[in-house]
Amino acid sequence: MSAFAGGIQTIDIHAHFYPESYLRILSELDGESPVTCSWDHADGPIITFWGGDTPPLHKTYYDFHERVKEMDDKGVDIHCLSLTQPMVHWADPALALKLSETYNDACAEAHKAYPDRYLGFAMLPMLQPDAALEELKRRADLPGMRGVYPSTQIEGRELSDTLFFPHLRGRARDGLAHVPASGPRRRI
């Protein structure tokens, strides 16, 4: 834990996390998928999506035990874990739900292992309203989950699109949603 005077905690509310279980699912996808993951690089897995590659992911992106050591080194008390690009919205409905559940379960696992260090922002398959609402309800029972992390633009649709109204109503009843800016900055 950090040594800041006065007991003030340092909280990183925008801490991206690619659980190994999520990456393993991506690595099992065939070459026709717009998103894949390769574990062939010595420095870490590489995610390929929409024609580009991430740099090799450092172990702290996918191993929450290693991440705690880095948090200690940097004086950070709590990470609010969130998935970043490519998220799940590119996938067919069944895969989007599987990836969301896998990610959310991994966040809960990190919280159970380090309850004072990790909280999670859930991922939902936003383009499938019924599945997203069910996962939103399931997420409420997972330990350490404190909100939802959507993009402001999902497959060309802004959060103001009526497709997302059921999710937004569910979140309003449920509490916090952390909404990162993405896509054109016309309005947020």
Residue ranges of model-derived segments:
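Helix-coil boundary/capping segments in enzymes
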Residues: M1-I188
